[in-house]
């Protein structure tokens, strides 16, 4: 997910997307532990998407406060 796409989302949509990605991250880690993971690069993609969403949510909160 690109940063421009994330910036277009509302605060509620950001929370939903974050929850979805955290659930996916959990499932990917579980698959890795059991040896069923096919695309190991997806773990890093999800991790970076989570960081992207958290960063933009924080920026939006700071802008609203200022």
Curated annotation (Swiss-Prot):
PROSITE patterns: RIBOSOMAL_L29
Gene Ontology MF annotations: structural constituent of ribosome
Classification via CDD domains: Ribosomal_L29_HIP
GO CC, one annotated term: cytosolic large ribosomal subunit
Pfam families xref list: Ribosomal_L29 (PF00831)
Biological process according to GO: translation
Keywords: Ribonucleoprotein, Ribosomal protein
Gene3D superfamilies in alphabetical order: 1.10.287.310
Superkingdom of origin organism: Bacteria
InterPro entries listed in its UniProt record: Ribosomal_protein_uL29 (IPR050063), Ribosomal_uL29 (IPR001854), Ribosomal_uL29_CS (IPR018254), Ribosomal_uL29_sf (IPR036049)
Similarity annotation: Belongs to the universal ribosomal protein uL29 family.
NCBIfam families in alphabetical order: L29
PANTHER family: 60S RIBOSOMAL PROTEIN L35/50S RIBOSOMAL PROTEIN L29 (PTHR10916), LARGE RIBOSOMAL SUBUNIT PROTEIN UL29C (PTHR10916:SF0)
Protein name in the entry: Large ribosomal subunit protein uL29
Organism: Rhizobium meliloti (strain 1021) (Ensifer meliloti)
